[in-house]
Regions:
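Mixed-charge, glycine-accented linear interaction segment located at domain edges/termini
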Residues: 107-146
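A low-complexity, Ser/Thr/Gly/Pro-enriched, surface-exposed linker/loop concept
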Residues: 46-51, 55-80
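A short, structural micro-pattern
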Residues: 36, 62-65, 84, 102
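Long, hydrophobic N-terminal alpha-helical segment
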Residues: 1-41
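Short, structured motif recognition centered on aromatic/hydrophobic residues
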Residues: 33, 38-44, 106-110, 118
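Intrinsic, low-complexity N-terminal interaction/targeting segments
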Residues: 11-25, 70-108, 122-128
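Broad gene-expression machinery/nucleic-acid interaction feature
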Residues: 39, 60, 87, 103-105, ...
């Protein structure tokens, strides 16, 4: 096992990062917006998709999104910090404003319709493993027809 430390500075980088965090689980209380640093941070139990299929491990990882101008949530209750969320994807949509090619919105999408929408100055993210891995109880499965 080699810990991940990925940097995203372009939408294509964020797509790679999104593949690594698919099926991560976290609690609502594991997310925070650091207003003074204009940074959003979430800590999750990430499935190690980068390992061979016979290995099923999870690791505690931190995802940081920088340059936040505005943060919004949908269908995520901040008054229930123990609620469990399953992360589906992280996406970047550029603004359609002329002269603002780097700015856009990062969407962190969860199962059940939950979403964090972050207006950002540019695509800027860090994903870093912060613990040793442990055996996963099962490998996440996806319906091929979905």
């Amino acid at each position: 096992f080699s810990p991940l430390r990925l940097f995203a500075r372009a939408p294509a980088d964020l797509d790679v990062m999104s593949a690594h965090v698919q099926d991560a689980v976290l609690q609502t209380g594991d997310m925070t917006f650091l207003d003074d640093k204009r940074r959003f941070v979430l800590v999750m139990n990430r499935f190690c998709w980068e390992l061979p299929q016979k290995e099923s491990l999870r690791v505690r990882s931190a995802l940081q999104i920088g340059g936040i101008l505005e943060a919004k949530r949908r269908n995520i209750r901040s008054d229930k910090p123990d609620s469990v969320l399953s992360l589906l994807a992280v996406r970047f949509a550029p603004n359609d404003q002329p002269g603002d090619a780097l700015a856009g919105t990062v969407s962190i999408i969860f199962s059940g319709g939950g979403e964090i929408r972050l207006a950002v100055e540019a695509c800027e993210a860090i994903l870093e493993d912060i613990t040793e891995p442990w055996p996963a109880t099962r490998r996440p499965a996806h319906d091929a027809n979905a």
